[in-house]
């Protein structure tokens, strides 16, 4: 993403740090579900939630050795969780399980942000439509002048499309 053209909130959603944070959330939730099912010890899920962390630079450092993004991520998180419970991180999961789930959640976050912006934009259009309900303007049809309308009507038409 090009920073100067990116809203700060959207940039955060698609940042490398947030991608890893979201992957960690997937790993935490998976470990908690596995603990509930008796697949891993409950203490492991607690340790993964409470101690699970990472440094992006450390992930990159490990990735230069492993040439695998998920192995480097799991290894880096495991360094924080500790050797007793690190073996339970990513247990029974594939790289795609984690990456695709994280990506889907990030897309949901992005859509929520876009929808919030559209709702705000719709409110502005509604308010401005009332303000300009008597302001005349030339209507358009087939790319040429048409019957006169008001700017308020134009704004209401745009609003109805949102």
Residue spans of the language-model regions?
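A helix-coil-helix interface module used to build multimeric assemblies
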Residues: 1-161
